[in-house]
Amino acid sequence: MTTGPSPIEMLTARNLECIRGEHRLFSNLSFSVNPGELMFVGGPNGSGKTSLLRLLCGLSLPDDGEIYWNGTDIRKLGVDYRDVMTYLGHLGGIKDDLTAIENLRISCALAGCEIDEDQAADALGQIGLAGREMLPARVLSQGQRRRVALARLLVTRTKLWILDEPLTALDVAAVELIKGILEHNLAKGGMVIMTTHQELVMSTVTVHHLVLS
């Protein structure tokens, strides 16, 4: 990983600092992620992993430092930055009373990526939920609910994916499926920044590890 903003780097963090209450989670944190690269963010609970991801997707502001997309501070980009970035939080945002299709379509619409019912059903089928598309989320297992949230990765057109614990509650087959989706995005020049407590071997792409303490 390299440091400092540059027009040729796709996502760059420079001297980030994050304070929560009286606790400094991290400071002077700098890195860059380029097309085709994956960065794993690790560290113990409470080290600031989720806080960092929220900074990178613009949901929170750093106490110090800057984040650049293609050489421009993301605070100046506004909606233009959200148009190139997909963020999936660790809770998934799944609503119990909505069907799998409804959950997927609404989450896509909120992210600025409208899809029709057929597209939603196709994505859910690809991610292993064929036959469960019209079931209310309340009857789905935790792993199936997670798949509904992750199905958005199959329809998004964004280059940068920021994923908070995407593998939580997934079985081995589902993890391998998500691994293939990530590799496909990276092969097209996409970028992935993610946290995970599970080991994920990615032998065909450039992988960085950022460990918070």
Curated annotation (Swiss-Prot):
Pfam families: ABC_tran. Its EC number is 7.6.2.5. GO terms for cellular component: plasma membrane. One of its GO terms (molecular function) is ATP hydrolysis activity. It is a peripheral membrane protein. It is found in: Cell inner membrane. Keywords: ATP-binding, Cell inner membrane, Cell membrane, Cytochrome c-type biogenesis, Membrane, Nucleotide-binding, Translocase, Transport. GO terms for biological process: cytochrome complex assembly. SUPFAM superfamilies: P-loop containing nucleoside triphosphate hydrolases. The keyword Nucleotide-binding applies. Belongs to the ABC transporter superfamily. CcmA exporter (TC 3.A.1.107) family. The complex is composed of two ATP-binding proteins (CcmA) and two transmembrane proteins (CcmB). This is Cytochrome c biogenesis ATP-binding export protein CcmA. It comes from Nitrosomonas europaea (strain ATCC 19718 / CIP 103999 / KCTC 2705 / NBRC 14298). The lineage of its organism: Bacteria, Pseudomonadati, Pseudomonadota, Betaproteobacteria, Nitrosomonadales. The gene is ccmA.
